[in-house]
Amino acid sequence: MFDGIGFMELLLIGVLGLVVLGPERLPVAVRSITGWIRAMKRMANSVKDELEQELKIEQLHADLKKAESQGLKNLSPELQDSIDQLKEAAQSVNRPYKVEDIATGSEPASSEAKPAETTTAKASNSTEKSDG
C-alpha cells in the first residue's frame, strides 16, 4: 500500500499529525482518510472493470465484423468463440423479457379464474337457500 514511503516517513507523518491534530482528533482524521482512500480505490476498480468490459465488447464486435467479411463458414477458432459468446449474450438478454411476458400472461388468466370460482360458489349457496 505504501510503495514509495518507508518506515521513517510514516513515523514522521504520524508525529506531525499528532502535533497538529492532537491525540483526540488524530484517530478520527485517520479513519476519514482511510475511508476516502477506500472510496477512491472502489471507484478506480469500477472504472477499470467498465473499461475492460467495453474493450471486450469492442473486440467481440471487431471479431464479428471480421467473421462477416470472411463469411461465417471458414472461421478461425477464436472468431467462432467470439460469435458463440455474442450469441449467448444475446440469448441471456432476451430471456428475462420472456420470463416477464410469461409471468404477466399467466396472472390475468389466474385472476379471471378466481372470480369465476367465487361466482359459482355464490350461485351454489343461493340455490341451497332457495331449497331450504
Swiss-Prot record:
Give the quaternary structure: The Tat system comprises two distinct complexes: a TatABC complex, containing multiple copies of TatA, TatB and TatC subunits, and a separate TatA complex, containing only TatA subunits. Substrates initially bind to the TatABC complex, which probably triggers association of the separate TatA complex to form the active translocon.
> What are the record's GO terms for cellular component?
TAT protein transport complex
Region (Disordered), start-end ranges: 90-132
In the record, biological process GO terms are: protein transport by the Tat complex
Give the residue spans that cross the bilayer: 2-22
Q: What species is this protein from?
A: Shewanella loihica (strain ATCC BAA-1088 / PV-4)
Where does the source fall among the domains of life?
Answer: Bacteria
Residues of the signal peptide: none
**Localization terms from the record:** Cell inner membrane
Gene3D superfamilies, alphabetically?
1.20.5.3310
Q: Name one GO molecular function term.
A: protein transmembrane transporter activity
Designated name of the protein = Sec-independent protein translocase protein TatB
Keywords associated with the record: Cell inner membrane, Cell membrane, Membrane, Protein transport, Translocation, Transmembrane, Transmembrane helix, Transport
The UniProt regions of compositional bias labelled Low complexity, in chain numbering, are 109-124
**PANTHER family from the xrefs?**
SEC-INDEPENDENT PROTEIN TRANSLOCASE PROTEIN TATA, CHLOROPLASTIC (PTHR33162:SF1)
Name the major location: membrane
What's this protein's family per the entry? Belongs to the TatB family.
The role this protein plays is:
Part of the twin-arginine translocation (Tat) system that transports large folded proteins containing a characteristic twin-arginine motif in their signal peptide across membranes. Together with TatC, TatB is part of a receptor directly interacting with Tat signal peptides. TatB may form an oligomeric binding site that transiently accommodates folded Tat precursor proteins before their translocation.
- Which InterPro entries does the record match to this protein? TatA/B/E (IPR003369), TatB (IPR018448)
The UniProt entry lists membrane topology as: Single-pass membrane protein
